Amino acid sequence: MIDQIIDEVTDSDPYQELLVTADGVAEGTLGVRLDKWLAEQLPELSRSRCQKLIESGQVQRNGLVCQDKNLILKTGDRLVVNIPELIPLDVVAQNIPLDILYEDEQLIIINKPAGLVVHPGPGHPDGTVVNALLAHCPDLAGIGGVQRPGIVHRLDKDTTGAMVVAKTELALHNLQVQLKEKTARRLYWGIVYGSPKEIQGTVNLPVGRHPGDRQKMGIVPVEKGGREAVTHWRLLERIGNHSWLEFQLETGRTHQIRVHSKQMGHPLVGDNLYTSPGSVNVNLPGQALHAHQLSLIHPVSGEIITAIAPMPAHFEKLLVYLRQRIP
């Protein structure tokens, strides 16, 4: 069992001193990485924040600055961690309406509309979910210490539905772990071209940046930079030459459902990036993909929180139109 000693000179002192000790562990290596140990001992900080502190020279080991996050700690190591105040983000708060599905002091779950980018970036300096959240939750500016405060996972610009955002460092770290350990449950609805032969299945193929088009993702071998990607799917309804599917994400790679559905031979309707444009006589904002349910464990209470995002109007209109076309 690893214990810790934390000495704080004053409540406002940014330095924390930690002594690595162990009960029943012989003198020598503990086999624990520095960044992992810090994140465990300082649960109010996310692991990425701990890594940034290490890389920026804010951690000393036995009196010497240590910038190696992979360092293996040993019994008796004394760590001094400087946790400076976070620099305010250069992102303006904007009064953009939010459809809130759930909110408390730890987290907020919103129903993201189509056309809204999650965070500022090239081509989208403002008018994003982050800008809206900063107006709704001013304290969010310091969470994570990056340009994406509190963002646990993302939805593509034209994907609608449930998305959780952390309001504290503790919640950010906890929710990131839930996604990594697959204890959070994310269900999506999608309308695709064609009709799969089976009624359910799993696509387990690595996803990475498309070698010929940097705007796209594709099936890329792990040895060439692809990352594990697993998508479970089941058929909800066959509608003529189209199908309504439910997808469950086991991993959360960029464009994962869009890439995997195309690989199945059933690309999403309206996804002009991954398939040739097709006319369905319904004004779609983009791909017909909706994150309709998000379930997670509350970071503090331990209760199961389930948020349901209602079907958006354009999605419902598409279903009605396709059903009417059936002879």
Curated annotation (Swiss-Prot):
Record key words, sorted: Isomerase, RNA-binding
Active site: 156
Domain S4 RNA-binding: 32-105
SUPFAM superfamilies given in the database record: Alpha-L RNA-binding motif, Pseudouridine synthase
The EC number(s) this enzyme carries: 5.4.99.-
Keyword Isomerase: yes
GO biological process: enzyme-directed rRNA pseudouridine synthesis
PROSITE patterns on file: PSI_RLU, S4
Reactions the enzyme catalyzes: a uridine in RNA = a pseudouridine in RNA
GO MF annotation: an example: rRNA pseudouridine synthase activity
Pfam family, any one: PseudoU_synth_2
Protein family: Belongs to the pseudouridine synthase RluA family.
The protein, known as: Uncharacterized RNA pseudouridine synthase slr1629
